[in-house]
From Swiss-Prot:
InterPro entries in UniProt: A-crystallin/Hsp20_dom, HSP20-like_chaperone, Small_HSP
SUPFAM superfamilies documented for this protein: HSP20-like chaperones
Name of the protein in its database record: Heat shock protein DDB_G0280215
Species of the source: Dictyostelium discoideum
Disulfide bond positions: none
Coiled-coil stretches noted in the UniProt entry, renumbered to this chain: none
């Protein structure tokens, strides 16, 4: 057995006594629970106590930082985990090593039913982890954040700064909040205002209150005026609506009957209406003339015969050429129409009809009118009238379009 020269004999005896005490303690304690069986690795020292409202758990975790510890509640079990990297060097040779040197540990504690995991308070300070667990019911799973004394102080400073900034912004938007801020700050931050600060807040409160009352009075008067103005607008709009309804189907022309622009527009509309009336009369005349020409062409036997005569000469030469009989332009007997005489004396011969007349000639005297020349002139006059009608119709349509465009332009520029 090797003896360590750095170890004192009485210290060795003390270590042996400690080992015997731990062994006897394990024999006298009950069997390990499920929570104890869940532990592994290095086991930090832990105390568990309670009062009527809380459970308190204290663990000794020397040389640990709060970032290396994880506390979590899962159902009835409180889980505490930690891991620390072991740093070993070859420069030093250890003769005794009792301090925690690194690795991973896990402690689990079984708690009664109804633990409020969301309300657990954790504090880590000077290598000691303190957990306060309320006995009331709550969430069954919760991750607990740890704050040491230094972290608590820093967070308190941050909260105070945030409250001051919020106070400044609120007072800028509403001066009346200057007095009420003291009560709100004492509630939020947990600190009470001293007399000096209270006096500072009390001084501008009276003037701020007067200012707020004046602003509220002005706002109320403005709303009253606004409501009154809206009522007047509604009444005027109702009057205008009733008046416009009484004007009939065309209220725009009635509203400004005496204006120059309206009179000019009315005059142009009247001209356009008269032009439409004249155009309709002209169209009726043109339709009658076109029907007349159409009937003439239809009864003449075609356009080829219109160039020579308006009737069938073969019918005349077969029994009616011996008497002085008057024929109309359709080859029928008619004394009322401008006729012509048929005699034996021939002044004009039409050899083109010799075959149809059996070799005889036809003489048309000057007592009526010569069928070929006079009838062609009559037809030509009708065709010329039809052509002029069409030209006039196009001209009238162009005039009507120009007049309508002028009316539309003037209506667009008119102010009603």
């Amino acid at each position: 057995m090797s003896i360590n020269w750095l170890t004192h004999p009485f210290e060795e005896l003390s270590n042996l006594k400690h080992s015997l005490d731990e062994t006897l303690k394990n024999w006298t304690e009950p069997a390990p629970t499920a929570a104890t069986s869940m532990d592994w690795g290095w086991k930090p020292r832990m105390d568990v106590c309670e009062n009527k409202d809380y459970y308190k758990i204290i663990l000794e975790l020397p040389s640990f930082n709060k970032d290396e510890i994880e506390v979590q509640v899962n159902g009835r079990f409180l889980s505490i985990k930690g891991q620390k990297i072991e740093h070993t060097t070859d420069e030093w040779k250890y003769h005794r090593r009792e301090r925690y040197s690194g690795g991973e540990f896990h402690r689990a504690v079984a708690l009664p039913e109804g633990i409020d995991g969301s309300s657990i308070q954790a504090k880590f300070q000077s290598g000691v982890l303190l957990l306060l667990i309320p006995k009331t019911g709550g969430k069954t799973s919760q991750h607990i954040s740890l704050f040491g004394r230094e972290e608590h102080g820093n967070k308190r400073n941050v909260i105070d700064l945030e409250e001051k900034e919020r106070k400044r912004r609120m007072e800028e938007s509403d001066p009346m909040l200057g007095r009420r801020w003291g009560t709100g700050r004492s509630l939020f931050s947990g600190s009470k205002l001293n007399n000096q600060n209270d006096t500072m807040y009390r001084k501008p409160s009276a003037s701020d209150l007067r200012l707020v009352k004046q602003m509220e009075t002005k706002e109320r008067e403005r709303r009253i005026r606004d409501t009154k103005g809206e009522t007047e607008k509604k009444k005027n709009a109702l009057k205008v609506s009733r008046y416009i309804k009484s004007l009939g189907m065309n209220p725009r022309s009635t509203l400004r009957r005496g204006g120059r622009e309206m009179e000019k527009i009315i005059h142009l509309e009247e001209r356009e209406r008269q032009a439409r009336i004249r155009d309709k009369g002209r169209m009726r005349q043109q339709q009658a003339l076109a029907k007349k020409v159409s009937n003439l062409i239809k009864h003449s036997g075609g356009a080829a015969r219109l160039r020579h005569t308006g009737f069938n000469y073969s019918t005349i030469t077969k029994g009616y050429n011996t008497n002085k009989t008057k024929f109309d332009r359709f080859g029928k007997e008619n004394d009322s129409f401008g006729g012509f005489n048929i005699n034996k004396s021939f002044t004009n011969q039409f050899k083109g009809f010799g075959k149809n007349s059996g070799g005889k000639s036809i003489n048309i005297t000057t007592g009526g009118f010569k069928a070929p020349s006079q009838f062609n002139k009559f037809t030509h006059n009708l065709e010329e009238k039809e052509r002029q009608r069409r030209l006039n119709d196009k001209k009238g349509q162009n005039d009507a379009k120009r007049l309508a465009a002028e009316i539309s332009h003037m209506i667009g520029n008119a102010h009603f």
